[in-house]
Amino acid sequence: ESGGGLVQPGGSMKLSCVASGFTFSNYWMNWVRQSPEKGLEWVAEIRLKSGYATHYAESVKGRFTISRDDSKSSVYLQMNNLRAEDTGIYYCTRPGVPDYWGQGTTLTVSS
């Protein structure tokens, strides 16, 4: 993953994840985050090319947008109107057996 860092409340950040080791276009992808306060929390999901359906956690709905580029084996998370409670380590993940986890990127939202 890339794109983490320090952002002020109300700011924006875009995370990127380039996946490897599997046929990216065949799998749903997720973003999850981990924080000391909330533990591991699912953030967003994007499904396959037939519509690229998306689903979001209530806490990020209307603020975060997940997208993907199958030609680049990449999944993205555009995050707007960031809040302190969005602070955490963000991972791209692929459900399945075995599952896939990116290395994670840290986002800190603080003034």
Curated annotation (Swiss-Prot):
The keyword DNA damage is annotated on this UniProt entry: no
Gene Ontology molecular function: antigen binding
A GO CC term assigned to this protein in UniProt: immunoglobulin complex
Keywords of this entry: Adaptive immunity, Immunity, Immunoglobulin
Residues covered by the Ig-like domain: 1-110
GO BP annotations listed: immunoglobulin mediated immune response
Protein origin, superkingdom: Eukaryota
Note: The sequence of the first 197 residues of the C region was also determined and differs in only 3 positions from the corresponding portion of the mouse MOPC 104e mu chain.
PANTHER family xrefs: IMMUNOGLOBULIN HEAVY CHAIN
Name of the molecule in the record: Ig heavy chain V-III region HPC76
Organism: Mus musculus
